């Protein structure tokens, strides 16, 4: 008999002295403001931000999608804590002008809030 155990996910916490973005649903930290690349993106549910790196985020399988800027291979990303879909990760850009997005993350504003040090 094989005993199945569920692996525990350890949550990353960003330094409290930095401005951060958190999941609006469970308040898990998602990104440091210093990792923000652009506020000029569109997600499937409205405005979105492009980040260089994120934490506490899982990644689904990549698939090809035609987005506003052309064909990309993207993978949906979700909060590791509450499993809410947050946006996507750019795995591959087919047009040379879009290559800068590869390996970067889109998080929709509808799923995140500002945390720590925004006063």
Curated annotation (Swiss-Prot):
Organ and tissue specificity: Widely expressed. Detected in fetal and adult kidney, heart, liver, lung and skeletal muscle.
Superkingdom as given in the UniProt entry: Eukaryota
Domain Yippee: 19-116
InterPro entries found in the cross-reference section: Yippee, Yippee/Mis18/Cereblon, Yippee_fam
Compartment(s): Nucleus, Nucleolus
GO molecular function: metal ion binding
Chief place of localization: nucleus
TM helices/strands, residue ranges: none
A Pfam family it matches: Yippee-Mis18
Disulfide bonds: none
Cellular component annotations (GO), alphabetically ordered: nucleolus
Keywords, ordered alphabetically: Metal-binding, Nucleus, Zinc
Residues binding Zn(2+), per UniProt: 23, 26, 79, 82
Family to which the UniProt record says this protein belongs: Belongs to the yippee family.
Record note on quaternary structure: May interact with FAM168B.
Protein name: Protein yippee-like 2
């Amino acid at each position: 008999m094989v005993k199945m155990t569920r692996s525990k996910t350890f949550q990353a916490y960003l330094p409290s002295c930095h401005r951060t973005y958190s999941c609006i649903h469970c308040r898990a930290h998602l990104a440091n403001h210093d990792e923000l690349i652009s506020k000029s993106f569109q997600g499937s549910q409205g405005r979105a931000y492009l980040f260089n790196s994120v934490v506490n985020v899982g990644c689904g399988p990549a698939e090809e999608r035609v987005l506003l800027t052309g064909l990309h291979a993207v993978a949906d990303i979700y909060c590791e804590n509450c499993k809410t879909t947050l946006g996507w990760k750019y795995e591959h850009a087919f047009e040379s002008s879009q290559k800068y997005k590869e390996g970067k993350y889109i998080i929709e504003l509808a799923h995140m809030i500002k945390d720590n040090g925004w006063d």
